[in-house]
């Protein structure tokens, strides 16, 4: 595996993980039943992934290392399926089924919606700039 790719993924992942950690510290105490730090990391990650998908599609000039840094590295470090899973299982073990369902829907539907929104925002900006 090329060293530049390894460094790109590792560097991006570190920055994304630090941001996720900071969001958790700031936001999880606000509403402990539905940890907002994890949710915001996943929603922001979805939005940024939409931006990245559309920009990468439009600009093939972005180097593979930059793509790895942004998507696999940074967004992979920012978003968190394992923490999401642990939080959902904790709610279910506490028999908080309503909140577990709300959390699942918020993360899954919210992240998909934010990814679509990211794509649409970039498309709108390109259309506006071309007009």
Description of each model-found segment:
Residues 1-131:
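Membrane-interface helix-loop junctions in multi-pass transporters/channels
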